[in-house]
């Protein structure tokens, strides 16, 4: 059987080391068990089974992240250290519980602080986010996983993260039951396991792809500034 050769061969070194950063926006502090953190750990374990990686799980509730849009908003601000981790990561997992049908306040704070990188891109045409792969992890004891997933995906896409197919894993427990009582169900849930495995496979594949074939920014500064000007223009 005749097989055509790809016009542009895609050489992806299988042993390319990857940095994977998981940002847990649970409102619980250490040492309390975080359901979101447990699912993030499951995804990270799947990633480690696939590739040579360095993984780190950061619990945002244990950091000091003041309100604001700059790189440093107070004398005590952990954002500069956190943004360094984000810049050196190949894959960033955005992990949040569902609170009142939406993402947690800490996930919203993270998104707001990331605006500093978006503004840097607008001003300089150089992006610290382009070429990075994003994944999403969600847990909760109420409905809303798909809504939260979609809203986060929209933000990350506009910021410049690459979102592979099936790049999210979630688990939603029985309404009215504390998620701590559902722990064993969560850890055995086949659909959640399938999503975690698919998420890991896809973020690793696309991270390797972009490492081997980095994106080229096309008129980054002008394009981004033009987009901002369009969004700021009064509606007719």
Where are these regions (language model features)?
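Short, glycine-/small-residue-rich phosphate/pyrophosphate-handling segment
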Residues: 125-173, 191-194
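N-terminal beta1-alpha1-beta2 submodule of the flavodoxin-like/Rossmannoid cofactor-binding fold
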Residues: 1-124, 186-236
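Long, compositionally biased intrinsically disordered regions
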Residues: 175-177
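Juxtamembrane/interfacial segments around transmembrane helices
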Residues: 135, 179-191
């Amino acid at each position: 059987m005749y097989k055509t050769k790809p016009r542009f061969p895609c050489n992806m070194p299988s042993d390319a080391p990857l940095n994977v950063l998981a940002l847990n926006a649970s409102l619980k502090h250490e040492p309390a068990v975080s359901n979101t953190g447990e699912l993030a750990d499951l995804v990270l374990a799947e990633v480690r089974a696939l590739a040579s990686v360095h993984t780190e799980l950061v619990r945002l509730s244990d950091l000091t992240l003041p309100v604001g849009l700059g790189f440093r908003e107070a004398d005590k601000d952990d954002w500069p250290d956190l943004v360094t981790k984000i810049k050196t990561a190949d894959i960033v997992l955005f992990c949040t519980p569902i609170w009142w049908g939406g993402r947690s306040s800490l996930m919203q704070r993270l998104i707001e602080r990331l605006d500093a990188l978006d503004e840097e891109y607008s001003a300089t045409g150089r992006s610290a986010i382009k070429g990075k792969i994003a994944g999403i992890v969600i847990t909760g004891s109420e409905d809303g996983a798909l809504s939260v997933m979609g809203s986060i995906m929209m933000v990350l896409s506009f910021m410049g993260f690459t979102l592979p197919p099936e790049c999210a894993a979630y688990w939603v427990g029985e309404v009215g039951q504390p998620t701590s009582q559902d722990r064993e169900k969560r850890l055995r849930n086949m659909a959640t396991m399938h999503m975690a495995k698919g998420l890991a496979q896809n973020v690793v594949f696309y991270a390797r792809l972009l490492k081997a074939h980095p994106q080229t920014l096309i008129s980054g500064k002008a394009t981004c500034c033009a987009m901002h000007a369009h969004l700021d223009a009064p509606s007719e």
